[in-house]
């Protein structure tokens, strides 16, 4: 049985990578071209992120999308 959904995994990885880079949610949102509240909702697993926005966030963090999906 899988205890964490893919949204939870993405949320955890996003928050960890963002903090490692010393970025606020607002700074990351500006780099990715999305709204700050959207980043917050993703980090709380409240939003089902699209592939296009996954790509924007990965580029903004300078990582591969797969790094955001690793369990």
Regions found by a protein language model. Give the residues of each.
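Recognition helix of helix-turn-helix/homeodomain-like DNA-binding domains
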Residues: 34-47
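Conserved hydrophobic/aromatic packing and binding residues within compact polymer-binding modules
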Residues: 14, 28-29, 39-42, 68
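Short C-terminal boundary/hinge segments that cap the last helix of small helical domains
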Residues: 62-71
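Short, basic-rich loop-to-helix N-cap that marks the start of a DNA-contacting helix
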Residues: 46-56
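DNA major-groove recognition helix of helix-turn-helix
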Residues: 43, 53, 61
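Short basic helix-loop element that most often maps to the first helix and adjoining turn
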Residues: 12-27, 31
